[in-house]
Amino acid sequence: MASPKEILKQVQDDDMPHWRLPAHPANRRSMRFFSDNAAAVHPRVMQAIQAADRLDTAYDGDRLSRSLDGRLSALFGTEVAALWVPSGTAANCLALAALCPPHGGIVCHRDAHIQNDEGGAPEFYTHGAKLFLAEGEGAKLTPAAIEAVLDAIPDDVHRVQPHAISITNATEYGRVYTPAEVAAIGDLARGRGLGFHMDGARFANAVATLGCTPAAVTWQAGVDALSFGFVKNGAMSAECLVFFDPDLAAVTRYRRKRAGLLLSKGRYLAAQVLAMLDDDLWLDTARAANARAATLAAAGGDRLIHPVEANEVFLRATPDEAAALRAKGFDFYDWAPGEIRLVTAWDSDEGDVGALADAIAAL
């Protein structure tokens, strides 16, 4: 049996180009474009966290947590039930558990975060629901792609039956669904009797691009549950699960507790969400991130793999070209062979963005 040290070495030696950051020269400052998860916490969020010290009610009984429903109902223009959670995976999986029974299935894109990057958590939290994988350019689903999956599933007791659809907006490749595109899927979901979930880890970036109301691209388009992301956009550790059918939240409150996600000092999570909502800070930070991505996209030219509609830029780059960028101090992830991913954030330094744009143009 391998020793812990041997196991650790094996893990470190495994080929993990998707997540490993090759070291840049030690004498150069790192300019990070690998993930908006690494972005700084916005000062106004920090202030809100500190202000929450003055409250002492535990779990979700404090006035900040209790105000979330009202604040988000006002934002979306309809009655909602909102639950804070400490991660996007938690938000996604609790939403899916509310929409899909253990014996059911969820249609999602082959490259969806719930399929590739949540470590089996969707299956765990739903107690065994199956993920049905669909195709689509830029990780976007269409009604036709979803129907192709649904039509291939016979109404047979021996086969898992679909119960929900999950899309990501903005997608894992930085593409944005318009309200009309979401509504087309929403119509399909209603017609088929399926729940409809939106993974909104970068929901703010999508809304900033669209210039529409949050309502237009969610409940007005048929979405039942939204994982409203804040961590990538200026928060520290708070995401918000928004149910447009408040009845869905009733049992989810118990699932959140059972899953160990009901933090005793939850007021600090609520404080972050509320700070992001104040004066539309969530949109201001998303617009800043999107604008910086647009600068990189302009430099990318023919190297662009996907249209840049949010804050992610995917470029064609040979290993030598990627190494040349890293030698100049830029940090980013390798993606597929011959591809790199650059992610901007609300706090991306404009000088760094300009330098990277120049370096890309010079390749």
Regions from the PLM with identified roles:
Residues 1-5, 12-13, 18, 23:
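A cross-taxon signal for low-complexity, glycine/charged-rich
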